Swiss-Prot record:
Superkingdom of origin: Bacteria
Miscellaneous comment: During catalysis, the active site Cys acts as a nucleophile attacking the alpha-carbonyl group of tRNA-bound glutamate with the formation of a thioester intermediate between enzyme and glutamate, and the concomitant release of tRNA(Glu). The thioester intermediate is finally reduced by direct hydride transfer from NADPH, to form the product GSA.
Protein's organism: Shewanella sp. (strain MR-7)
SS bonds (residue pairs): none
Subunit structure: Homodimer.
Pfam families xrefs: GlutR_dimer, GlutR_N, Shikimate_DH
Domain comment, as recorded: Possesses an unusual extended V-shaped dimeric structure with each monomer consisting of three distinct domains arranged along a curved 'spinal' alpha-helix. The N-terminal catalytic domain specifically recognizes the glutamate moiety of the substrate. The second domain is the NADPH-binding domain, and the third C-terminal domain is responsible for dimerization.
Keywords assigned by UniProt, alphabetized: NADP, Oxidoreductase, Porphyrin biosynthesis
Functional pathway: Porphyrin-containing compound metabolism; protoporphyrin-IX biosynthesis; 5-aminolevulinate from L-glutamyl-tRNA(Glu): step 1/2
Identification of the protein by name: Glutamyl-tRNA reductase
Amino acid sequence: MSLVAIGINHKTATVDLREKVAFSPDKIHDAMKSLASRTRSGEAVIVSTCNRTELYCNNGDEADIIEWLEEYHGLDHQDVAPCLYNYHGQAAVKHLMRVASGLDSLILGEPQILGQVKQAFVKAKEAGTVALTIDRLFQNTFSVAKKVRTETEIGAAAVSVAFAAVSMAKHIFSSLSTTKVLLIGAGETIELVAKHLKDNGVASMVVANRTLERAQSMCEEFNATAITLAQIPDFLPKADIVISSTASPLPILGKGMVEKALKQRRHQPMLLVDIAVPRDIEPEVADLDDAFLYTVDDLHSIIEQNKASRKEAAEQAELITEEQSYLFMDWVRSLESVDSIREYRSQSMAIKDELVERALNKLAQGGDTEQVLIELANRLTNRLIHAPTQALTVASRQGDLNTLGQLRTALGLDKN
């Protein structure tokens, strides 16, 4: 068993590269099946969010997995390789546990990543790329993330990218009581944004979504107005703040649409926060006067303040993930020991069966019983002690006293 984790995130790559290696929801099922086919166990999970893309595989070759990622997205090795990180064995286990616990997030301790990891695991199960080891790994990871939440203060005053976006809006507008907000998307992140906006007394909210029913369902809770994406041009001129987070592969707001809206607003300033990957708002919008565009990469100052306040809780959480990752590896080793014992017994039984059959044939042909039994005993002894004798000889010749001692203990040579 060899667990491998390979990824790219907000710490190692720009939003431009991150959006190139992201997997869209409608393609991730087939992507997981394709990735799993490159492993010896057929086990693989892809975690793809706006801030990270990570591949978790059991019994996969690191170079082969990286090659698959580059081929899948049509990217050059020299562009991707410097931004990748990789973990093996216990380090891979700990990394996943840290990710799910929010310890590796853009905003330390944010809870949304756990839901995203769970969703990735569900999709992998649907794709048939989960077996014993990966299943146990992710189930344990979810338990560890819960343990971190309940036993530390990492989740106190819970924050997220959504919280950071609203904090930035408050910083720029000082008060949100007179501002009108257009939210694009109706997923978990936008729902959190709406919650924070409501808590801060925003004047009004409009939610635009591809599926009107989903937007309407969300709007009931926040007393907001639901519209379709096609209606955005009609509502954009009224928006002081635009916050967007969808899974659209193409930008939803273009420079021309925003420019037209600003003219209708008589050039009153508009704050646009794009927290989607790939981006929902064309980067050229930032060139417009009175349009202030920010992406997830612009939220670092808020994030750094958050990290400082949660440092102590994070240290406690790190200890939990460290301990639990070792416990998981103990379970993995127990599986390996069971396999080894099974193989050893099977091998010994095969030798016995072979030699017994040979002895019975000789007896059937009239061989002397005593001579046949002595030959059977000698042959069985020689076959069974051959491998241990070779191992003892090599360890002794190399002066490897540690291995020699372990072999003597295993063979019962040091018993009184």
